Amino acid sequence: MAAFPPGGTFFDTLKRSFTDVPVESGKIATTQFLEACESLTTLFDVLGSTAFKPVKSDMTGNIKKIRDRQLAAPVDSETLQDLVRNELATKKHTATEGLVWLNRALDFTAQALRQNLTNSGEEVSVSFRSAYGNTLSKHHSFMIKPIFSAAMSATPYRKDFYAKLGDDQARVEKELGVWLSSLENIVKILNDFLASKEAKW
């Protein structure tokens, strides 16, 4: 089954794109960010393997932790940075820790797709394995690594993956590039913020 409307691309199906997440003075809008993350998880359905279920489940679990905090204290959580600062001030860190793990997963996904988009002859599995080694692998236990390694090995062939994103490959690559640039910008902002003293517990 196609993951895109006739004449369109996968990116037309997203409820929220990272290109539509407001970022003002380096502050990231919480609601739109979470919607964009939820939309990103549908990419793992396009990858088509049940092996990616743990990856998707991990991301949706962390999205829920952040949203639960936002719903509990909406005024204090309009941006991700405000949410983190205000949660840590209460001596709790459930949502903050969720954001750390969610951002690692976003970084992994962004690096994998960027590497694959840049290297047109590379299979998707190679790009995802490389990105996993650069990102999530450093933080996963020996129990978790085999589960994620199985997902890397279960990715579709490159030609099949891109065909699932749209019929017009030039348009797919262009839209993927724009979407990725926005995602990478958000990941960089979060990497810097989460590494700062004010995001530590």
UniProtKB/Swiss-Prot annotation:
Write the record's keywords in alphabetical order, separated by commas: Lipid transport, Lipid-binding, Transport
Q: Please provide, alphabetically and separated by semicolons, the GO molecular function terms listed in this UniProt record.
A: ceramide 1-phosphate binding; ceramide 1-phosphate transfer activity
Q: Which InterPro entries does the entry link to?
A: GLTP_sf, Glycolipid_transfer_prot_dom
GO CC annotation, single: cytosol
Gene inactivation effect: Partially loses the ability to secrete liamocins and leads swollen cells and accumulation of intracellular lipids.
Question: Mind telling me which Pfam families this protein's record contains?
Answer: GLTP
Induction data = Expression is regulated by the cAMP-PKA and HOG1 signaling pathways via the transcriptional activator MSN2.
Signal peptide positions (record): none
- Applied use: Liamocins have high bioactivity against the pathogenic bacteria Streptococcus spp. and can be potential new specific inhibitors of oral streptococcal biofilms without affecting normal oral microflora. Liamocins are also able to inhibit human cancer cell lines such as breast cancer cell lines T47D and SK-BR3 or the cervical cancer cell line HeLa.
Q: What does this protein do?
A: Cargo transport protein that plays a key role in transport and secretion of liamocins, glycolipids (also called heavy oils) composed of a single mannitol or arabitol headgroup linked to either three, four or even six 3,5-dihydroxydecanoic ester tail-groups.
The protein's name: Glycolipid transfer protein
- The scientific name of the source species is Aureobasidium melanogenum
Q: What is the lineage of its organism?
A: Eukaryota, Fungi, Dikarya, Ascomycota, Pezizomycotina
